[in-house]
């Protein structure tokens, strides 16, 4: 993958992984009308962009995925041209305070955000199909998002080529 093409590819892969994991789907516990199957979770409770909880009408939990390619001048630099970049994957697990207890899964004593972060960590950490090398959990912190919403933010890091060694059909040059 080259340059920014990793962003959409990683987001799509993670969204697919989340909706196809029965433990994660059960932990989200989506009660929104019109959600018939796991595909319906996309852009209702699993987003590939950041989401403001106040734009949602239901007491629920949702997950957002963002991918960033931060500047890092010292990483494997070759004079002025960097060979590698270190994309970060930021996953926000946001729950309304009334949805924090995991009442729908017996024997789970963690709150919903902590439990989901454990499941996501197990699913992603150490995998080698995101860029080059293994994806690594760098941070997993808890915070609140204004009144009524609690958040757990997970940050993973991977490595990728800054420029492709060859052009594939998904990486067409923009003129």
What are these regions (language model features)?
Residues 66, 88-94, 155-159:
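Residue-level recognition of well-ordered beta-strand positions that form the cores
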Residues 84-104:
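Short acidic, glycine/tyrosine-flanked loop/strand segments centered on an H-E-D-like triad
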